[in-house]
Amino acid sequence: MNASNWSVYLILCENSAFYCGISPNPQQRLAIHTAGKGAKYTRVFKPVAMRIVAGGMDKGTALKQEIAVKKLTAAQKRQLWEQAEKMPSET
C-alpha cells in the first residue's frame, strides 16, 4: 500500500449531517458504511453520498486534516462539500 494514498472524505447522511473520515480506499469505505458495518454514526444515519475533500497524503497528514474538518461548523462543512470532488457514483 502506498503511504501517500490516504484521502479525507465527507459523507452526507440521511439526516442532512456530515460524517468525516479517512481511508486509503474511499469507495470500499463507503460500501462498508452503506452496509451498516462502518462507524456507529453511519449505522444510525445512513449514508446518502460521499465526496473526497482531500487526497494523496500519508495517514498522519490525513488524520490531522480529518480533525480540522471535524472542527468546522455545519455551514463550513457544507461549503467544503460543494467544492469537493464528486464520487463516480454521484455523477
From Swiss-Prot:
InterPro entries: GIY-YIG_endonuc, GIY-YIG_endonuc_sf, UPF0213_domain. Signal peptide: none annotated. Transmembrane segments: none annotated. It comes from the Bacteria. SUPFAM superfamilies: GIY-YIG endonuclease. Residues 4-83 form the GIY-YIG domain. CDD domains: GIY-YIG_UPF0213 (cd10456). Gene3D superfamilies: GIY-YIG endonuclease. It holds the Pfam family GIY-YIG. PANTHER family: UPF0213 PROTEIN YHBQ (PTHR34477:SF1). Belongs to the UPF0213 family. This is UPF0213 protein NGO_1598. It comes from Neisseria gonorrhoeae (strain ATCC 700825 / FA 1090).
